[in-house]
Amino acid sequence: DDNPGGNYWAYMTYGYFAPDRRYSSDKSYGGPTKEFKEMVAAFHNAGMEVYLDVVFNHSGEGGTWYGEKDNYNTAELTFMRGLDNSTYYSLTKDAAGYWETTGCGNNLQCDNPTVRNFIIDSLAYWIDEMGVDGYRFDLAPVIGREKVGNEWVYSKSAKTILDIIKL
């Protein structure tokens, strides 16, 4: 099964700075990026804008999605977990598991400044380098909340990612 999370729509993101090569006909090094840019240019030449569907509420790193079905001891350390697990993910109070409040799996810790910068850098990359015109955010409210104690809350006074990216 080459579909992370067992789906075909690829909402289990691994690479926030690269097109999914499964959807590219050119599998060579740099091929998917080249094809994506060519696709965006073709749409623009036809008078259409390109909006990217982005998923920042969770990632595709396995081992944390299905509770007892997953073995946390053998969870993949392919990306953010291997860099700094407690910075990128919202951990339970005992740090033995992951918060899961969306039905999608491991919540990214979007109120952490490092994670916010990561998200903003990714959004800027897709506009500046890849030429997209805008975004559709999967579960957008998740990136606008912060953790206070053991609860996730929406603070009207907090400066969220959604506030930062408004242009």
Predicted regions and their residues:
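Substrate-binding/active-site clefts of carbohydrate-active enzymes
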Residues: D1-G131, L139-K156, I164-L167
